[in-house]
Amino acid sequence: MSFVIAAPETLVRAASDLANIGSTLGAANAAALGPTTELLAAGADEVSAAIASLFAAHGQAYQAVSAQMSAFHAQFVQTFTAGAGAYASAEAAAAAPLEGLLNIVNTPTQLLLGRPLIGNGANGAPGTGQAVGADGLLYGNGGAGGSGAPGQAGGPGGAAGLFGNGGAGGAGGDGPGNGAAGGAGGAGGLLFGSGGAGGPGGVGNTGTGGLGGDGGAAGLFGAGGIGGAGGPGFNGGAGGAGGRSGLFEVLAAGGAGGTGGLSVNGGTGGTGGTGGGGGLFSNGGAGGAGGFGVSGSAGGNGGTGGDGGIFTGNGGTGGTGGTGTGNQLVGGEGGADGAGGNAGILFGAGGIGGTGGTGLGAPDPGGTGGKGGVGGIGGAGALFGPGGAGGTGGFGASSADQMAGGIGGSGGSGGAAKLIGDGGAGGTGGDSVRGAAGSGGTGGTGGLIGDGGAGGAGGTGIEFGSVGGAGGAGGNAAGLSGAGGAGGAGGFGETAGDGGAGGNAGLFNGDGGAGGAGGLGIAGDGGNGGKGGKAGMVGNGGDGGAGGASVVANGGVGGSGGNATLIGNGGNGGNGGVGSAPGKGGAGGTAGLLGLNGSPGLS
């Protein structure tokens, strides 16, 4: 029994629930008493009377059993409640001597250093922006900072001692003009504990929302605190930065950046906060999302992902760009997304770029559509690790009468590798309803040994009047050995997008990247295929991309094959696209000193 744990508050709530169940059953039994125990015979004959008497007897027997069960239930609830009270009394009796003992332990350090040895810090009073009371030197969590009065910054959260979590920062006060900043989160315990969250920024009624408070840093072990959200206003306030994770932490990442504040009536949403760094060995925190834009306001940019640990760790993902919504005439522009964080020095992958914000169209006829935000750039890899992928471009919406469409955002470029690792893939271009879709992002450069990243596909043009996005170029394998990245495919649209060129191979060894295929054209020509990449000294040239087909116009031209250098075959040319007149096939690439020329593509 020495290992039995009881929570008196939970037991009391359970006893109350049991009593309510008994009351509900008692009310139901009382309601059924008359209809089930006093049945009238269906007729004046003996059989009907016997049947009614039989069922009434069953009802009376049920009521007798129910009365016995109700009595047992009441006794059980009474015993259960008494047990909960006994546990609570025992806990209170045991706690009283411990409180006295704790006072004895804390008194010397309180007198000498002004801080207790064990205990949580006191919270700051609301509406004062107060800093918090001191917590225990050995063990205890920092107190929460007090919220600010109108126009006053929130109080900082308290720092923990050796063991404990930092306190949350107080909320910034609202202002008639600009909102006040939120308080910073307190630092985590020196040995173990997470940083406190930053406080949210205050509302800026006619100006800019308050800045979100930065998250607190951890000590040796623990997660970084989350950055506070930016306050809403004409321009949204920026989100606070995430706190750094513990110096020797491996599992927990840096704190995420705070979300940018909302913007209204033509302003700009707040930028998301930067993710916290990853100490020595952990991952960086994600960047905060950009703030939402309302009534013609642009969405805020996403925050940059935090860098990975100094030695090892992946970069944090970039924050998503904020959505921009239109007013009666002008569509809102989506915010650009944040770049991915860089990896650590030795091992780790670069962070993925965030997604661009969506641009929503104007609600009135004749208005313009909203422009999507640009995708974020992927973070750079470590000495041993790949670059991060680029983010997807934001969606471009149309207006209410479908006349003026918004432009899709371009995909972000892939991050570069350093020593050994592949470049990150380029992000996909954003789609558009009636405007130009976004182009795909360029693939990242490979390391000294590593392949180039693939180019991102062009965005799709959804309706008539749209233009498909061009595919992104494949990344080069810029070092000694590695294949070039494949080019991204062109996007579908009334007018199609061209495919991206393949990346070039490394100096000594590797094949060139294949060119991307051209997109499908609905009313215009099919997109042209991308050119194949050049091979290294030993390797084949990349094949050209196929030309895109067209429903009513000419097929796209096939891309030419890439050339070989010393030993290897030239790449084959891409086939021409199908259409009212077929597209011309691409030329084959030139062979090296040893090898065959590439075949031309079919027309």
Curated annotation (Swiss-Prot):
Coiled coil: none annotated. It comes from the Bacteria. The keyword Ligase does not apply. Residues 309-333 are annotated as: Disordered. InterPro entries: PE-PGRS_N, PGRS_rpt. Keywords: Repeat. It holds the Pfam family PE. Residues 1-93 form the PE domain. Belongs to the mycobacterial PE family. PGRS subfamily. This is Uncharacterized PE-PGRS family protein PE_PGRS24. The gene is PE_PGRS24.
